[in-house]
Design a protein with these regions (language model features):
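Serine-esterase "nucleophile elbow" of acetyl-processing enzymes
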Residues: 2-67, 72-73, 79-91, 96
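Alpha-helical cap/lid subdomain in secreted, periplasmic
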Residues: 14, 57, 76-239
């Protein structure tokens, strides 16, 4: 395998106003895919369209979200996805946005069942994924959305809960911090806004954001400092 330098957040300083449009890939689970938003396609799709507008930064954004993916599955396809997004002059992507982990945290068949991915194994897998991604290009990580516990189990099998979500997102946040990878803590932000605010932004399954939820998520993402520098238009308005 070709050896690459490790990229830290310090190498994310070039803004789109200072360089040519970037090629960006977003990899992860249904939160990246946009499941639950039949109107606008989720936050990644809306960001992709915004960057295509005449006065925008012109970045190319590939949505590589797969429903149900866990950390190991994202890691397995990461480099292949990265290599196959070459365009002019075989250029590879300039930035990776990761968002994964909630499917690892779910408990199987009952409230006290085993996690889909054992926590110790998850810590190892998320560290490996981040290391792998950093060998390719700079990385940003968008954290998971808190579920509606009252709607569980999902598909009569998966018991998602806040306690496990917190453990898994904290492991991810710490691993990102250790590698100087910017981490957007959506879980803590949304929990702080209260049950009423949060539940209005989830679909009936209690797991996926709805159209309003993805709008809120997009606003959190575009105002996040590590990504905000990539915008040339500060006046973003969702239509």
């Amino acid at each position: 395998m070709r050896t690459f330098p490790t990229y830290s957040s310090m190498q994310l300083s070039l803004s789109p106003t200072q360089c040519q449009p970037l090629k960006i890939i977003a990899l992860g689970d249904s939160l990246v895919y946009g499941f639950g938003d039949p109107e606008k396609g989720g936050w990644v799709e809306q960001l992709r369209r915004w960057w295509m507008l005449p006065d925008s930064s012109g970045h190319v954004l590939y949505n590589l979200g797969v429903r149900g993916d866990r950390t190991q599955q994202v890691a397995q396809r990461l480099e292949v996805e990265f290599r196959h997004r070459g365009e002019l002059r075989n250029r590879v992507p300039d930035l990776i946005i990761l968002s994964v982990g909630v499917n690892d945290s779910a408990r199987l068949t009952r409230l006290n069942g085993r996690n889909c991915t054992d926590f110790a194994l998850f810590e190892s897998e998320i560290a490996s994924l981040l290391d792998q991604a950093q060998q390719l290009c700079p990385v940003l990580f968008v954290g998971m959305v808190p579920v509606d516990e009252a709607k569980m189990p999902f598909l009569n099998c998966f018991y998602f809960n806040h306690a496990d979500q917190y453990r898994y997102k904290e492991a991810t946040r710490i691993a990102c911090n250790q590698r100087q990878i910017p981490y957007l803590d959506i879980f803590d932000q949304w929990m702080a806004r209260g049950d009423t605010w949060r539940n209005k932004r989830l679909t009936e399954d209690g797991l996926h954001p709805n159209t309003l939820g993805y709008q809120s998520l997009l606003e959190d993402v575009i105002h996040w400092e590590p990504l905000a520098g990539y915008h040339t238009r500060p006046d973003y308005q969702l239509k």
